[in-house]
Design a protein with these regions (language model features):
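N-terminal Rossmann-like NAD(P)+-binding domain of SDR-like oxidoreductases, especially those catalyzing
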Residues: 1-207
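A glycine/serine/threonine-rich, flexible loop-to-helix segment
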Residues: 42, 143-145, 216-225
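A conserved pocket-lining segment of Rossmann-fold NAD(P)-dependent short-chain dehydrogenase/reductase
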Residues: 97, 163-177, 201-215, 226-250
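A conserved catalytic-core signature of glycosyltransferases
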Residues: 131, 221, 245
Length: 251
């Protein structure tokens, strides 16, 4: 049986990856340490999802590990024949990153470097899938020729990005936020390991992801958090741009 390693296995994308891989016949090693609870509080904890995966999936092997621990990460790879890496673990919030830039960079950039090095040393042929973010583009999209209507900001229908921004957009010369910088650093590392060491790496620059396992909190996971506010009657605040910003959600 093939072995896949999924980091952030209790999170939204990580947990769905675990389920799909197990269904496809893989043995899945899930790396998780519930840092989301320390970032955003107990309502954002991934522990319930991790416990549910462990109790319902026979081929799921949970490993409690902080990806900033280079020796621990290396040991996980050295002790197993890993044939696929799905790296979703991250500190995912702009605001939180500004509170503690060192932790943000440590998790997002150094943690990714630790995984890449371990993969290079022990599983160089394993596809390495990295969940990057559209925040690597910084505020460049704000300088597009946006049209302000009564309810939203929109691009002209004949604009090349009307149906979405592709990876051709530059990530340079923009304000990224500290979170965007740490994720852009990781994104570039994943690309460079692919090119320089000829490893099969890929970056997915998603944004506004949601789904049934999302532990939404005010600082991250806005759609899940919005639904939570609707159900509980809690006020929901939209910040900036007069509430006219437009986001495409990926389920």
């Amino acid at each position: 049986m093939k072995t896949a390693l999924v980091t952030g296995s209790g999170g939204l994308i990580g947990s769905q990856s675990v389920i799909k891989l197990v269904e496809a016949g893989w043995h899945v090693v899930g790396v998780e340490n519930d840092m989301r609870a320390s970032f955003f509080g107990p309502e954002a904890s991934t522990r319930p999802v991790s416990d549910r995966l462990a109790s319902t999936l026979d081929e799921f092997e949970p490993v409690e590990l902080d990806i900033r621990d280079a020796e621990g990460v290396n040991r996980v790879f050295a002790d197993r024949k890993v044939e696929l890496v799905v790296h979703t673990a991250a500190q995912p919030s702009h605001d939180w990153a500004a509170r503690d830039p060192q932790t943000d960079f440590g998790v997002n950039a150094i943690g990714t470097l630790n995984l890449l090095e371990a993969a290079r040393n022990h599983a160089p042929d394993a596809p390495f899938i990295f969940c990057s973010t559209n925040k690597v583009y910084g505020d460049t999209p704000n300088f597009l020729p946006l049209i302000e209507t009564d309810t939203r900001l929109e691009l002209p229908e004949d604009h090349e990005y009307f149906d979405g921004i592709d990876t051709g957009m530059s990530i340079d010369h923009s304000t990224h936020s500290l979170f965007g910088v740490s994720k852009a650093s990781a994104d570039l590392l994943v690309q460079e390991y692919g090119r320089y060491f000829e490893m099969p790496t890929v970056c997915f620059r998603g944004g506004c992801l949601t789904g049934p396992q999302h532990a939404g909190a005010e600082l991250h996971g806005f759609l899940a958090y919005l639904m939570k506010c609707v159900v509980t009657g809690r006020p929901y605040t939209v910040f900036g741009y007069d509430g006219k910003q437009v986001r495409d959600n990926i389920h």
